[in-house]
Structure formats: C-alpha cells, structure tokens
Regions:
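N-terminal secretory signal peptides that target proteins for export/translocation
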Residues: 1-10
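Bacterial N-terminal signal peptides
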Residues: 14-26
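Short alpha-beta junction capping motif
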Residues: 54, 113, 118-161
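Extracytoplasmic/secreted envelope proteins and their assembly/folding machinery
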Residues: 82-86, 134, 138, 161-165, ...
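Surface-exposed patches in mature extracellular/periplasmic domains of secreted proteins
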Residues: 95-106, 149-153, 175-183
Length: 268
C-alpha cells in the first residue's frame, strides 16, 4: 500500500511523522542504485479518449548514453514510477481522475504528443534531437505543453547539465533558463512546498537538488513551460514508494512535486 502523501494547501489533513537524519539520507542514496522493479521497453499505449493520461517522452539515446540495466535512457523507471504517481493523483486531488490501467509513451516528433498537456522525460543529459524532433519539441512547448525533465546530473563522464542546456538552446534559442525558487506557483499549485531545495536527492554526492525552467517570453510572471529537476530523480521515490525500501517522508515529498507539476500543467 502506498504511504500517505502529506498535507496539501489547506485541503487535506494527512499527518506524517518523519525521522529525518542519516538513515533517511542513506536510504535515499541506496534507492538510486537499486535495480528497476519492472524492466521493460514494451509500449502498449491506450488510445486517446480525453481522459488525463500520463505520457512519457521516448527518444533515441545519444552517443555514450547510459543503458541502465540494458534499458535505453528514456525507459528508466518505466512504467512503475508513473503508475504509482497516478494512484496518488487519483486519491488525493479529488479533481483529476487519471487513466489508471495504462500510461503511455510517445516519441518526440509523433503528432500524438500534442494530445498530452503534460509529458515526462528522464535522463535528458543523454538526449539528442534531429531537426524534426527539435521543431516538434519547440512547437509542443510554445503551444501550451508542459514537460517534467527528471533524473539527470553530471556523472560517469557525462556533462548532463551541459547537454541539456545545449539541447534546449536548439529547441528555444530565444529562451533563458532560470532557477526556480520557492515563490514559483508550480510549488504551490496543490501542495505547499515551502522549500523545494530541502528535498533530499537520492544521488550520492551530487549536491543539492536544483529546479530550473523557462517561461513564455522569458517573463517569470507568464506560463512556466517546463521544470528541470537537476541533481535529482524524483520518480525513483515514486517507483519504490510501496515497498518499504525508502522512508515514507521521502516518498511523500516526491509525490508532492509530482502532483503539483500535474496540477500546474492542467491549470496554466
């Protein structure tokens, strides 16, 4: 059973007793090195029917890409992570009733991408795009799509951040990456996340979690087009939340980010 999520902004009254400290941090680091719970790249998409369906972005892993447990970069944590998040989203919001039987994978450049207000991508540090994919991603963002970029850092000789910045420069050359602080509406769209940077990353020695984004017209008062969870792997906590392998508080915090991202994408 999934643990309770926490307390949303003036809506719910879940209470979680948290034992923070060394054990929590060690559990977080250990979780990042665990084998995936469900190893598959088989895609069995549900047909579009208007319901909210979680969609993961597929892409070709770039040269030197990280094939974790023989999975291509886009598939890390698929589909356990998003299935767990959909259970929480269905249970706590009272508003969004997501499709529960399946989550989808849509490859960048597929016109189906535009059916999804929110998409999710892991390992953008290994992302490469051809010109058609670059245009498709640009059009998606400018037409109202919202992307969660998750699970990347600088490691194993890979400049994950540098690669991500270069790809986004190609997609939105006029755009400017900006750090997201606690005042950004994405951290208050459902749950009140008072200090996002206090989130404990499961990456050992990666430094503190960082959150970056781009806004329409580079104006922070306008719509946020994507959020990049750098030095972070929020979905790893979703994937393992019902196993007892990680402290409930860490999974709760990760779910708060996920729910907020979904709610923001549906209301902006």
């Amino acid at each position: 059973m999934l643990g309770p999520v926490g307390t949303p902004s003036k809506r719910l009254t879940y209470a979680v007793l948290v034992a923070w400290g060394t054990l929590a941090v060690q559990a977080a680091y250990a979780q990042c090195t665990a084998a995936p719970r469900e190893v598959t790249t088989e895609v069995n998409n549900a047909p579009y029917d208007g319901r909210f369906t979680f969609a993961r972005l597929g892409y070709e892993t770039g040269p030197g890409g990280y094939y974790y447990h023989n999975l291509p970069a886009w598939a890390h944590g698929y589909p356990s992570s998003e299935k767990s998040l959909m259970k929480i989203l269905d249970g706590v919001t009272g508003i969004v009733k997501p499709r529960m039987d399946r989550t989808n994978v849509v490859f960048i450049g597929d016109p189906e991408m535009f059916n999804y207000p929110l998409t999710y991508m892991v390992e953008p540090g290994y992302l490469t795009l051809n010109p058609l994919e670059t245009k498709a991603l640009r059009d998606y963002l400018l037409k109202g799509g919202f992307i969660i970029f998750d699970d990347f850092r600088n490691s194993r000789g890979n400049d994950g951040w540098g690669n991500f910045v270069e790809v986004m420069r190609q997609v939105l050359p006029e755009g400017r990456l900006m750090p997201l602080d606690s005042s950004n509406p994405v951290f208050h769209s459902f749950f009140e996340i008072k200090d996002p940077h206090a989130f404990i990353s499961c990456y050992d020695g990666a430094g503190r979690a960082e959150f970056w984004g781009m806004f329409e017209n580079n104006d922070p008062s306008r719509r946020l087009m994507f959020v990049a969870n750098f030095n972070n792997d929020i979905a790893q906590y979703w994937e393992w939340s019902d196993t007892g392998f990680t402290p409930i508080a860490l999974s709760n915090d990760a779910y708060k980010f996920g729910v907020n991202y979904v709610m923001y994408s549906l209301t902006h």
